[in-house]
Amino acid sequence: MEETMNNQEAPETSEEETVAVENTKAEKVLPNFGPGDTIKVHARIKEGDKERIQMFQGVVLKVKQAADGGNFTVRRISYGVGVERTFPFLSPNVTKVEIMKKGRVRRARLFYLRKLSGKAARIKEVKQTPS
């Protein structure tokens, strides 16, 4: 039984994956955004053997910072139905993030927006002063 276990190669995850994750961290530079901001996420979608870039524009509900990169959740209304997507910061499928509007909110988690609709779900926009 020991011979069969020795013949099987264990997946080498320690060095190779660590180097890959560190390279991803070094290459990924996303703009500084937070809850309440309206952003456009360019996500790589694989359908069968084809790949394409799909844009997902919506309001950031939460940003979770973590040692492994963290993630952020974006919500939009599509054909009258609320759609939320969570994107990892270090995902190779997130190609680009654009900030469309900066929102002014007083909460770190905007889950209350799920219950609101129409004008009640609006977020005040922060006016950018020219530098």
From Swiss-Prot:
Keywords: Ribonucleoprotein, Ribosomal protein. It comes from the Bacteria. Transmembrane segments: none annotated. Residues 1-11 have a biased composition (Polar residues). Residues 1-20 are annotated as: Disordered. Gene3D superfamilies: 2.30.30.790. PROSITE patterns: RIBOSOMAL_L19. Pfam families: Ribosomal_L19. One of its GO terms (molecular function) is structural constituent of ribosome. GO terms for cellular component: cytosolic large ribosomal subunit. The keyword rRNA-binding does not apply. The keyword Membrane does not apply. GO terms for biological process: translation. HAMAP family: Ribosomal_bL19 (MF_00402). This protein is located at the 30S-50S ribosomal subunit interface and may play a role in the structure and function of the aminoacyl-tRNA binding site. Belongs to the bacterial ribosomal protein bL19 family. This is Large ribosomal subunit protein bL19. It comes from Dehalococcoides mccartyi (strain ATCC BAA-2100 / JCM 16839 / KCTC 5957 / BAV1).
